[in-house]
Amino acid sequence: MMHLLKKILRIVKIDSNVFAEIEKEKSSLFQGFIIVLLTAFSNALIARQYLFSGHSAYEVPVLILIFMWVFLNWYVLSHIINFLCCKIFSDGKKLNKKKSVLKLIGFSYSPELAKFVILFFPNFLQVISLGTFIWVITCQALATKIIFNYKSFLKSLGIVILSYILQILIVIIFVILIYNFF
């Protein structure tokens, strides 16, 4: 447990060496899952406290949707990043690193754990949310740079941003299809 906390602190400090260590460890996929679970829990608590307080009819379905969204986001974003890095921006290398990307993207959500502070300081909801989002993007770009041995941080940052754009488009298409189906 202490080992996981030390890794989380090093990720939060954006220590590039910890990403390489995590990529090599076999147990780090489960640890990445734990971080994503804690992130989902913090987001669900914030939504319950500040967005849906007083609307008990919506509480449970929304909390379930938040947990599902966080885990789908982790899984889909990891696969989009892996696809873009392996197929489109491969630099001639044909390495498929699905598991490594899943591990490190899970760990890159560590800054989101700072959202627990919002429970005590609700006036900083927007500032902390935006700050942790930028922090997570930075961690994901660094993880992408390390996994795929890119020389440029900007290239990996562009891939992460493109991955988010593609994920948003997938969600929009999915919502349109569901809306038209029902």
Predicted regions and their residues:
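Selected alpha-helical membrane-embedding segments in polytopic membrane proteins
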Residues: 1-99
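Juxtamembrane "helix-exit" motif on the non-cytosolic side of transmembrane helices
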Residues: 47-54, 118-119, 175-179
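Membrane-helix interface and helix-disruption motif detector
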Residues: 55-58, 127, 181-182
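Hydrophobic alpha-helical transmembrane segments and adjacent short intramembrane/lumenal linkers
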Residues: 82-170
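Juxtamembrane boundary at the C-terminal end of a transmembrane helix
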Residues: 168-182
